[in-house]
Amino acid sequence: MKQLFLIIGAPGSGKTTDASIIANDNANITHYSTGDLLRAEVASGSELGKTIDSFISKGNLVPLEVVVNTIITALKNAPTNTILIDGYPRSVEQMLEFDKVLKNQSEVNLKGVIEVKVSEEVARERVLGRARGADDNEEVFNNRMKVYLEPLNEITNFYAKENIHHIINGERSIEAIVADMKNLINELLK
């Protein structure tokens, strides 16, 4: 049985960095981002990959069901039994579809949804300070923040009702955040 942790957080919360460090430090943990999974599926040349490519190549959004199937396929084929996925779900629709698919199978168990919590001010400082790409400007940041915040309460309430929502304070050093996240994951795997 694969044990899954979803890592969510605002743009600039450090969720991707935290998950990467944890997976790099532990050979028994695999870390994926949704975008990487879709690109890998396309690269594999599978039927699912061809379907995904038909949307991406035209600049269209990949349909919800296809994204969820891609994630589930990757989880089942993951090289380890413990998996971290960051930045998912991004919408209530994604969450509900993912939940439905997870409940209809027995190979993957959602152990926890870990929210790396930072204030909007800290997120803004980090994103606009890192200048990682063309999308790291104030206007784009504000839009990404809005897209993140709009469904957040509904997403966290849904997982809180399932007793799997956990919050980690993301406004500390990477070392402190990673240590807390590692401890939480280890506790939940017991």
Swiss-Prot record:
Enzyme class, first EC level, given as a word: transferase
One GO CC term on file: cytoplasm
Which positions carry the signal peptide feature in this UniProt record?
A: none
| Positions of region (NMP) | 33-62
EC number(s) given by UniProt: 2.7.4.3
UniProt xrefs under Pfam families: ADK
Which residue intervals make up region (LID)? 129-135
- Name the positions where AMP binds: T34, R39, N60, L61, V62, G87, Y88, P89, R90, Q94, R132, R144
What Gene3D superfamilies would the database entry show?
A: P-loop containing nucleotide triphosphate hydrolases
Pathway(s) = Purine metabolism; AMP biosynthesis via salvage pathway; AMP from ADP: step 1/1
Q: Where does ATP bind?
A: G12, S13, G14, K15, T16, T17, R130, R172
Keywords, sorted A to Z: ATP-binding, Cytoplasm, Kinase, Nucleotide biosynthesis, Nucleotide-binding, Transferase
GO MF assignments: adenylate kinase activity; ATP binding
Q: Which Gene Ontology BP annotations are present?
A: AMP salvage
Which family would the database say this protein is a member of? Belongs to the adenylate kinase family.
PANTHER family membership: NUCLEOTIDE KINASE
Function text:
Catalyzes the reversible transfer of the terminal phosphate group between ATP and AMP. Plays an important role in cellular energy homeostasis and in adenine nucleotide metabolism.
Q: How does it assemble?
A: Monomer.
Annotated protein name in UniProt: Adenylate kinase
Q: What is the lineage of its organism?
A: Bacteria, Pseudomonadati, Campylobacterota, Epsilonproteobacteria, Campylobacterales
Q: Which gene encodes it?
A: adk
